[in-house]
Structure formats: C-alpha cells, structure tokens
Amino acid sequence: MPFMKGREPIRRTLKYLNAGKLVLKDKVRIFSVNYNTYGAHHAGARDFVFWNIPQIQFKNPEVQVLTLKNMTPSPFVRCYFDDGRDMLIDLDSRNRNDIIDHLVKVVGKTREQLDAEERLKESKDNPANFGYGCGRHCICEIPGQVPCPGTVPLPDHMRGKILFAPK
C-alpha cells in the first residue's frame, strides 16, 4: 500500500483520523500553530503538530489549518474567528496531551453539542427512515411502495399462502 510509507504511516489511516478529540466550534475559521523545530520547550508543540494536526484537519474540513515553523521564540496556537477576533493560546513547555486537552476545553465543541449534532444528522435528514421517532410511521406512506396489507389486501401473486400452496 503506497499510503503506508514514510514516517509513522499510522497517522494516515482512517481509524486514527476518526479518533481525534478536537472538533472546533463553528465560529473558528483559521487555526494556526507557531513553533520551532529546535529547543526543548517546543518539543510538545512539535509532537502535537506531528500527531494531532492530521486529526484536526480531518475532523474540521471547513477550517484552514496553518503551521508556521521557526518564526517565533515561543510556541503558540492562534485561532481566528469569523467575526474578526482572534485567540492566542500558549504552548510553551507543554506535552501534546496537555495541549489537546486544553484546546478541547477552550475552542472545542462540548460532548453535548457533538451528541446532539450526531443524533440530528442520523435520524431526520434521510427520507428513507421510517418508524418510531421519524416523520413516517410506516413504509406504506412513501409513494410507490406497496400499501399495508391491513388496509388494502395484497394481490394474489404477492401472497405466499397462494404461491406456495399445494395444487
């Protein structure tokens, strides 16, 4: 498999990308990470960029993600919002797990928001869904489907009782 080449190819698997914890709020438009490729106090930011930026890009396709290397004395994340404001988050001497936990608390959606969006996405948007809690309680309400046998009797060529009866 050609995508399994290079440094740590596990980062490009779908299972790994879906396991990301950070889903940014809808107001965030640009997410930039500034760090250096040298220095001990930048180690957590380097690991964060290496391991977590692919997950953030996968989970937030509408957000522009920037990484700026070797331009700053201290590592930081800057989030630009759609109303023109920006937020600066310091990453100095933190490990990558602390960074991701802090970002989830500050600019990430809450668990309740994610659950509500998931429920809304899965149930109501598909017109083929029917049953309890959906817009249609039975498949017979969909145009072009066979009506319920309780209301309209089925034709004889559709009834197993007549098809498979001994002649």
From Swiss-Prot:
Keyword annotations of the record: Mitochondrion, Ribonucleoprotein, Ribosomal protein
Classification via Gene3D superfamilies: Glutaredoxin
UniProt main location, coarse: mitochondrion
Ribonucleoprotein as UniProt keyword: yes
InterPro entries for this protein: Ribosomal_mL43/mS25/NADH_DH, Ribosomal_mS25/mL61, Thioredoxin-like_sf
Protein's cellular compartments: Mitochondrion
GO biological process, one term: mitochondrial translation
GO cellular component terms listed in the entry, alphabetical order: mitochondrial small ribosomal subunit; mitochondrion
Domain of life of the native organism: Eukaryota
Gene Ontology MF terms: structural constituent of ribosome
Keyword set includes Transcription: no
Assembly, per entry: Component of the mitochondrial ribosome small subunit (28S) which comprises a 12S rRNA and about 30 distinct proteins.
Similarity field: Belongs to the mitochondrion-specific ribosomal protein mS25 family.
Protein name as it appears in the record: Small ribosomal subunit protein mS25
Organism from which the protein derives: Drosophila melanogaster (Fruit fly)
